Amino acid sequence: MANIMIPSKRPRAPSFSEKHPKYVGSSDWLPAEKDKAQVQLTNFLELCRFCKKNLRHDEDVFMYGYLGAFCSKQCRAKQMACDVFRDFSRQKANVKKGRTSKDEGLDRISSSPSSSSSSSCFYI
């Protein structure tokens, strides 16, 4: 039996890179932010997010949250406790300010884990 190719009913739509060749691979906007994000992505398995010990590639790594790598279950549990405490404190502060839970969602979006915090939790 012969191999027969049946043409598609519709032609393929051009991709973004075909429509806009000058934008392909050029993310020059905010190069410092791009470099910071790239470092965070490449280094998140090198240090424990809580105690900052070097993580060994031949040992277990315990994960939690977005890019949260930990050397032990204890460090991971401590970070989880810090996160719960931080969220509880934020909710309590919002109640005092008369904010609603909808406003709290905006706070989470505007604050990032890398921003400075008065708690003893550490972020990379």
Curated annotation (Swiss-Prot):
One annotated Gene Ontology cellular component of this protein: nucleus
Region (Disordered): 1-20, 92-124
Disulphide bridges: none
InterPro entries: FLZ1/2/3 (IPR044533), Zf-FLZ_dom (IPR007650)
GO biological-process terms attached to the record: response to starvation
Sorted UniProt keywords: Metal-binding, Nucleus, Zinc, Zinc-finger
Bias kind Low complexity: ranges: 110-124
GO molecular function: zinc ion binding
Zn finger region (FLZ-type): 43-87
Record's keyword annotation contains Zinc-finger: yes
Induction: Up-regulated in response to mild as well as prolonged energy depletion.
Subcellular compartments: Nucleus
Domain of life, source organism: Eukaryota
Family: Belongs to the FLZ family.
Protein purpose: May act as an adapter to facilitate the interaction of SnRK1 complex with effector proteins, conferring tissue- and stimulus-type specific differences in the SnRK1 regulation pathway.
Quaternary organization: Interacts with KIN10 and KIN11 via its FLZ-type zinc finger domain. Interacts with KINB3 via its N-terminal part.
The protein, known as: FCS-Like Zinc finger 16
Source species: Arabidopsis thaliana
Lineage of producing organism: Eukaryota, Viridiplantae, Streptophyta, Embryophyta, Tracheophyta
